[in-house]
Amino acid sequence: MAAPVNKAPRDADLWSLHEKMLAQPLKDNDVEVYNIIKKESNRQRVGLELIASENFASRAVLEALGSCLNNKYSEGYPGQRYYGGTEFIDELEVLCQKRALQVYGLDPECWGVNVQPYSGSPANFAVYTALVEPHGRIMGLDLPDGGHLTHGFMTDKKKISATSIFFESMPYKVNPDTGYINYDQLEENARLFHPRLIIAGTSCYSRNLDYARLRKIADDNGAYLMADMAHISGLVAAGVVPSPFEHCHVVSTTTHKTLRGCRAGMIFYRKGVRSVDPKTGKETRYNLESLINSAVFPGLQGGPHNHAIAGVAVALKQAMTPEFRAYQRQVVANCRALAEALMGLGYRVVTGGSDNHLILVDLRSKGTDGGRAEKVLEACSIACNKNTCPGDKSALRPSGLRLGTPALTSRGLLEEDFRKVAHFIHRGIELTLQIQDAVGVKATLKEFMEKLAGAEEHQRAVTALRAEVESFATLFPLPGLPGF
């Protein structure tokens, strides 16, 4: 008689190990991943995070994100799922939708919201899919002028974003001298291009948008107006910048930037009566709800990330508190203090200041560029990102640095602290110029980095500045989960 392939004792041992695997904490189960997370946690703790699109989520948000909701699959919408066992998932999604409308003061009879997008880029593409036919026309702020990749970016030689591949895209621009959006040129180009959708949104623009002007341009051309408020959604919630909801048909956003939630997306859309015929009294109603919901699911996504929806719901509750509004006011105050300090040190800030959470520093007058400065600052534990400035000839060597205040404001930095941060940045850029002088202005970024790493005097300067930066940064607690 043949013996069983697996003996019972061995099966029991394996099952015991399986149970142990499920119950082990990360540090015991996967030390490699655990150590990477610990290193990243330490980098965030000892460094100065100035990337404008980043923030530090609260402990409550991260707890929701790491909950059992990760286990549940739930294709469809509340009350209309393709899976059983979704009673509490429905309850959660409806709560998140309710809070999303409340935080922006929206009447549920006039506005709806889809909270299932995985992030901002899928949210935007869902709107385009819903409202613009294939190869239909879209206008968004050009990426080198402060727009976002998903707003239709392309170069003279190549269509880069999927938006520009599947739709016809014409960018609008800023005035290269002032850095402000050229609304007159936008109006003229829209008249010639006849877009189906105009996008009012930015990723590196420090001034408030003129939503009323944009809506008039959209109406004159029979276009929808969509706001992408991903960067400023927390500021809008707190009432410290103008709201797009008064003028726009659709509003999309991420949830992890100034809103300080986890990584996800939302799409708000108008509903109810769109217009009334003055002669007949006949009402025309918006049909955006069905179009957008169908585009998100089943058009572009499968099951929603329920753990992320929970994290968003928690962040939205926090966003309705007085302390959150105070935080957002401080974000703007800190940004203005940073801008003023850098201008006082001789730097040119595009548009001469900021209305929101970010600034763009133009380094052309200093004789260097954003790529080199970013690398030196990173070596000194200051995280920011290179960015094109208005008038840049090539995106391969952008002239600017984008700096944002949301993350460090979450750690408790105030105006005087940001003035100190400005001096750290200044010293990093001065070091950038020294290395550039040594290697030559025409050297490649690779050659520049080799000089930075190989020259003892430069390494001494980096080490000294990094020590000061890290000593300063560790004075401020890092939000999040204990132990991480």
UniProtKB/Swiss-Prot annotation:
Role description: Interconversion of serine and glycine.
Cofactor(s) the record lists: pyridoxal 5'-phosphate
PANTHER family named among the record's database cross-references: SERINE HYDROXYMETHYLTRANSFERASE, SERINE HYDROXYMETHYLTRANSFERASE, CYTOSOLIC
Residues where N-acetylalanine is found: A2
One GO MF term: mRNA 5'-UTR binding
Official protein name in the record: Serine hydroxymethyltransferase, cytosolic
PROSITE patterns, alphabetized: SHMT
Lineage: Eukaryota, Metazoa, Chordata, Craniata, Vertebrata
Subunit and interaction comment: Homotetramer. Identified in complex with ABRAXAS2 and the other subunits of the BRISC complex, at least composed of ABRAXAS2, BRCC3/BRCC36, BABAM2 and BABAM1/NBA1.
Alphabetized SUPFAM superfamilies for the sequence: PLP-dependent transferases (SSF53383)
UniProt cross-references to NCBIfam families, sorted A to Z: PRK00011.1
Pathway: One-carbon metabolism; tetrahydrofolate interconversion
Entry EC no(s): 2.1.2.1
Gene: SHMT1
Keyword field contains Cytoplasm: yes
Protein family per UniProt: Belongs to the SHMT family.
